[in-house]
């Protein structure tokens, strides 16, 4: 099988969904902007050579509907001969796009793929038009469709206290702010035009969502968001609502060499698993274990992890059961995570993979693992190896 390599990985800044920087920018434009950026950064690649475009998006309606992958590629003026498909595995959509493209390359059906994802949660809210089948309640708890309550369940099962959650969430904002000041995001963020609070066109090259003033004390003052009486999960310990897109350029190792393009990493293994919807946030544990097994590696072999922070209450049980509690500050989400940066659903999989690759290069390490929980009980993981 062909080795699959990552040639490039970029993202937009993350904008606040409520009246944020991208309130007047459509999801297709965020996507097309990145598609154009990837091509301009890799001039030796003729856009007509792209075999397929895989683009993650969850709420595929309104501006995100009718195959946003194709709409965005047309906006980006990619040749009409290049096909495009929109992928939906809820929170794991753009990582699933990565997996789909990688498999096509592995078996020789493709040599070049552009992947990524987008979600404009300000324009198309997460629960827009959702209508669960009433028959689901025969086999699945009704609360399993409410992500915050699944996080509450995990917190209770794993004895994750409110204090632990507040500390983890504060760390996310502090790390993300420190990474911004240090310029660690510069290599992955493509400056993107939006509007400031006064409506003036502004070029954003930083994440608007991060709240550097966040402290454990300020988080402790927040009320539980999902279980007002007995709950511990607050808005402050949940992933922020944000708008954004991310993209990666995948190639067979042979094609990258032929084009004179430097491979940043290869995909070592991939995995997707299912789990009980009531504890959907636990999905990264079995997914990571399966991906590691397929890679012939152990948790100890992995130098850096990116775990999508849907909630502090679900991240901490995953970290605990992967045996990484003592390694958080050395190995996990070094630049913060979704609690600070937000979780634009269709964007996050390739966003965390992009951040992981940059951290692997900055720290000069060999192996990295990106993993996410997925609504309704799934987990997805990818192991990367630098080349």
UniProtKB/Swiss-Prot annotation:
Q: Which UniProt keywords apply?
A: Acyltransferase, Cytoplasm, Fatty acid metabolism, Lipid degradation, Lipid metabolism, Transferase
Give compartment(s). Cytoplasm
Q: What is this protein called?
A: 3-ketoacyl-CoA thiolase
SUPFAM superfamilies recorded: Thiolase-like (SSF53901)
Q: Does the keyword Acyltransferase apply?
A: yes
> Its Gene Ontology molecular function terms?
acetyl-CoA C-acyltransferase activity
Predominant location: cytoplasm
Any GO BP annotation: phenylacetate catabolic process
Q: How does it assemble?
A: Heterotetramer of two alpha chains (FadB) and two beta chains (FadA).
EC class of the enzyme, as a word: transferase
Q: Does the keyword Acyltransferase apply?
A: yes
* The organism of origin for this protein: Serratia proteamaculans (strain 568)
Q: Which residues form the active site?
A: 91 (acyl-thioester intermediate), 343 (proton acceptor), 373 (proton acceptor)
Example GO CC term: the record gives: cytoplasm
Question: What catalytic reaction does the record list?
Answer: an acyl-CoA + acetyl-CoA = a 3-oxoacyl-CoA + CoA
Q: What pathway annotation does it carry?
A: Lipid metabolism; fatty acid beta-oxidation
Q: What does this protein do?
A: Catalyzes the final step of fatty acid oxidation in which acetyl-CoA is released and the CoA ester of a fatty acid two carbons shorter is formed.
This enzyme's EC code(s): 2.3.1.16
- Protein family: Belongs to the thiolase-like superfamily. Thiolase family.
Instruction: Give the source's domain of life in one word.
Output: Bacteria
């Amino acid at each position: 099988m062909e080795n699959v390599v990552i040639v490039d990985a970029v993202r937009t800044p993350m904008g606040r969904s409520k009246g944020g920087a991208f309130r007047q920018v459509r999801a297709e434009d965020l996507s097309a902007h990145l598609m154009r950026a990837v091509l301009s950064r890799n001039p030796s690649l003729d856009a007509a050579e792209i075999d397929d475009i895989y683009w993650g998006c969850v709420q595929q309606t309104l501006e995100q509907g009718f195959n946003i992958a194709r709409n965005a590629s047309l906006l980006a003026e990619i040749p009409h001969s290049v096909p495009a498909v929109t992928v939906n595995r809820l929170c794991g959509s753009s990582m699933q796009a990565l997996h789909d493209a990688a498999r096509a390359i592995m078996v020789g059906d493709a040599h070049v793929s552009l992947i990524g994802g987008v979600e404009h949660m300000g324009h198309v809210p997460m629960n827009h038009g959702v209508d669960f089948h009433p028959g689901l309640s025969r086999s699945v708890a009704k609360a399993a469709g409410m992500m915050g309550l699944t996080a509450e369940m995990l917190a209770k099962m794993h004895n994750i206290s409110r204090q632990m959650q507040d500390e983890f969430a504060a760390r996310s904002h502090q790390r993300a702010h420190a990474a911004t000041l240090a310029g660690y995001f510069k290599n992955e963020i493509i400056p993107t035009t939006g509007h400031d609070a006064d409506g003036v066109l502004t070029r954003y090259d930083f994440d608007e969502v991060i709240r550097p003033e966040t402290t454990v004390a300020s988080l402790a003052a927040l009320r539980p968001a999902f279980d007002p009486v007995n709950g511990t999960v607050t808005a402050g310990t949940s992933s922020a609502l944000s708008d954004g897109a991310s993209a990666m350029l995948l190639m067979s190792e042979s094609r990258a060499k032929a084009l004179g393009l430097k491979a940043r990493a290869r995909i070592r293994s991939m995995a997707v698993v299912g789990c009980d919807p009531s504890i959907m946030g636990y999905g990264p544990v079995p997914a990571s274990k399966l991906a590691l097994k397929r890679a012939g590696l152990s948790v100890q072999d992995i130098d850096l992890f990116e775990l999508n922070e849907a909630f502090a209450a679900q991240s901490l049980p995953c970290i605990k059961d992967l045996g990484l509690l003592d390694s958080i500050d050395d190995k996990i989400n070094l630049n913060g995570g979704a609690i600070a940066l937000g979780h634009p659903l269709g964007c996050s999989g390739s966003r965390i993979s992009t951040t992981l690759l940059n951290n692997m290069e900055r720290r000069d390490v060999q192996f990295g693992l990106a993993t996410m929980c997925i609504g309704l009980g799934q987990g997805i993981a990818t192991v990367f190896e630098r080349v």
